[in-house]
Regions:
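Short loop-to-helix capping motifs
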Residues: 36, 145-146, 190-191
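Amphipathic alpha-helical dimerization/coiled-coil segments
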Residues: 94-119, 125-127
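Hydrophobic packing residues in well-ordered alpha-helices of helical domains and bundles
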Residues: 84, 111, 128, 132, ...
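Short linear motifs at protein or domain termini
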Residues: 1-101, 106, 211
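C-terminal all-alpha effector/ligand-binding and dimerization domain
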Residues: 7-8, 112-119, 157, 164-211
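Hydrophobic, amphipathic alpha-helical faces that serve as interaction scaffolds
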Residues: 87-103, 133-170, 206-209
């Protein structure tokens, strides 16, 4: 049997990921104009894959395309932020309720282990962000609804545009950890209603801190 030929990752997808990380790291600031010519020269590519990459980021809400003006890094308004957090609260609390009711003991132990890692990262903001996101995404994987997963992934990309503000509030990391403990306690008790409530409260408090 002949070997299967795998198509390498498209160039525009690689460029999209590079730009995505620069946006998340604030190298490309919210509201800033994206200089296509400069970036194309920097990456040693033509403007075609760069424009395709920008289209991808536009569909994710990270970039805003303006007629005859080009691409700009999206600025998240208070309304945008409230809408994103509202949807995430609905989607992720629903997933959390499913996990509380249906997860295996091994899966709950895995989430508990991630929570322990979160506790250790309290003094390291970036590490806390990383483990926090891992916990939320693993919970979604266990809930096992690929349509919900895709919606959450896109919403979380927009949320990252404002994520640094969410933990700048004094004591917010400790508050977030306490909220995670409440979620974890409800999960381990297999109390779906309490888990849903705890996750919704987590996002409500997160929005208040980020606004």
């Amino acid at each position: 049997m002949a070997a299967v030929s795998l198509t390498p990752r498209a160039l525009y997808e690689e460029v999209a990921e590079l730009l995505r990380q620069r946006i998340f790291n604030r190298e490309l600031a919210p509201g800033s104009w994206i200089d296509e010519l400069k970036l194309a020269e920097e990456y040693g590519i033509s403007r075609t894959p760069l424009r395709e990459a920008l289209k991808v980021l536009a569909t994710e809400g990270l970039v805003t395309m303006k007629v005859r003006r080009g691409a700009y890094v999206t600025e998240v308004s208070e309304r945008d932020l409230a809408d994103v957090y509202h949807l995430l609260a609905l989607l992720e609390s629903d997933a959390a309720g499913v996990v509380a009711a249906k997860a295996s003991d091994a899966q709950l132990k895995e989430l508990a282990a991630l929570h322990k890692e979160l506790e250790k990262a309290v003094g390291q903001r970036e590490r806390f962000f990383e483990i926090n996101e891992t916990f939320h995404m693993r919970l979604l994987e266990i809930a096992n609804n690929r349509w919900r997963d895709q919606m959450v992934a896109d919403l979380r990309k927009v949320m990252k545009l404002n994520r640094h503000n969410s933990l700048l509030k004094s004591g917010r990391i400790q508050e977030s950890l306490a909220e995670h403990q409440g979620i974890m306690n409800a999960l381990l008790a297999r109390d779906a209603a309490a888990t849903v409530q705890a996750m919704q409260a987590h996002f409500k408090n997160g929005l208040e801190a980020a606004a």
